[in-house]
Amino acid sequence: VRLRVTGVVNRRQLLAALVTVGLWPEGARSATTAQPTVQRRWASGNTTLAPLGWLNEQLLFNGDRTLGRIDPQLDSPVWTVPHGLSSPAVYRPRAAGQSVISGGQRELGAWQFDTGQARWLQKAQIQIGTPFVTPERSYVGDGHTLMALDNATGAVAWRFASTPDTLAAYAPTVAGDTVFFGPGNGLLYALNAPDGRLKWQLDDSKEWQYIRQMFVTGQVLVAGTYTELLYGIDVDTGKILWKFKAGNFINSHHVAGDTAYLWSPTGWIYAINIHNGSVRWRHQTTRYGNRAANWAPMMAELVTFERKLYCLDMAQVLHVLDAGNGEELQRIAFAHDLRPTVSPLTSTTAAVASNTGEVQLVQW
């Protein structure tokens, strides 16, 4: 096969070309390759989209200007409204019950899920963080304080103050009647969800400052730090059950069932047993001495769907792995720039967000 190259070809275009002509680097040949086609395009009214949300078979989007809901079966959004925030919406919209929750660093707001009608807007006293949303309440940081907001009215049910001059930028999480909160002071708090009363606190500040993400499965809180450590913590007592050292910072992790998945910049995808922190499997993404086979770094969150793990790298290649054993099943190379978000809808379709502000339904 002879390839004629003119002008400047970037890595993404080269990967797409290799897929087209049936070529692929050594080390990736066990995975099938595919090129996606765009089946539907939805204009969002945004220049820059945040990651997409998903609830009840509906896509949710927000960005620098608007908030909206999409039925993937329809050619036009169900509704799109100007969000009216004084700064861009920076995280994916959350939804639970009848509310869609969206915000930026200066405000947090709620909109009606069915119609997009605005319900309330809560202005920051210091800086709004990322919320965790339940059907009745939204839990969100404002500066060093955690607030519990009523989803119907925006009324503050309670506040819990941590150490001044810290920023609770990352989302808390909720399991049963407990809210878990790590505001960036090296502490993890367990609070009583109805009234904000402190149940226990864990101080491991010698190892972490921020807790970036938290998931609860059964009796285990899986907490990622903005360092190289992933924790398993007993939800009732705060006892550390295990620590996993990834070898470099953990951008994000994902929990499905009794397995936590993460990408480490050391060049591995790990699947971790959440009960004891042992490695179920690992998949190499950086092959030293064979740069052509390397994955690009990842900003997008890992996603599981129908026992597959979806990993979108920064070269716009979607890697599909068997979630049970880590075998790479498929590589899907996009020829256009994407935002770091992917929402699998079926085994051959997904929703993605383009760098031009479109939400796209793609098929491969």
Regions found by a protein language model. Name each.
Residues 34-54, 79-94, 118-133, 159-175, ...:
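Extracytoplasmic beta-rich repeat domains
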Residues 62-64, 103-105, 141-143, 183-184, ...:
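Structural signature of WD-repeat beta-propellers
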Residues 59-60, 100-101, 138-139, 179-180, ...:
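Conserved beta-propeller blade signature
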Residues 1-9, 16-23:
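N-terminal secretory signal peptides
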Residues 117, 145, 155, 187, ...:
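Tandem repeat domain/solenoid detector
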Residues 339-364:
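Blade-level signature of beta-propeller repeat domains, shared across WD40, Kelch, NHL, RCC1
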